[in-house]
């Protein structure tokens, strides 16, 4: 769960700094961690 929070924080900071490459990778991290958490919840 802390990885998801960190990915969201990174995305917000990248957006504020207009670092579009980091913003893109942070969004991928958010999706990746979110899917991982859902997988654990549903037993995948």
From Swiss-Prot:
Cysteines joined through disulfide linkages: none
Location in the cell: Secreted
Functional note: Has hemolytic activity and also inhibits the growth of gonococci.
Gene Ontology BP terms: defense response to bacterium; killing of cells of another organism
GO CC annotation: extracellular region
Organism, as annotated: Staphylococcus haemolyticus (strain JCSC1435)
Broad class of the protein's primary localization: secreted
Protein family (similarity comment): Belongs to the staphylococcal hemolytic protein family.
Name recorded for this polypeptide: Antibacterial protein 3 homolog
InterPro entries: PSMbeta (IPR008846)
Keyword list, A-Z: Antibiotic, Antimicrobial, Cytolysis, Hemolysis, Secreted, Toxin, Virulence
Molecular-function GO term, any one: toxin activity
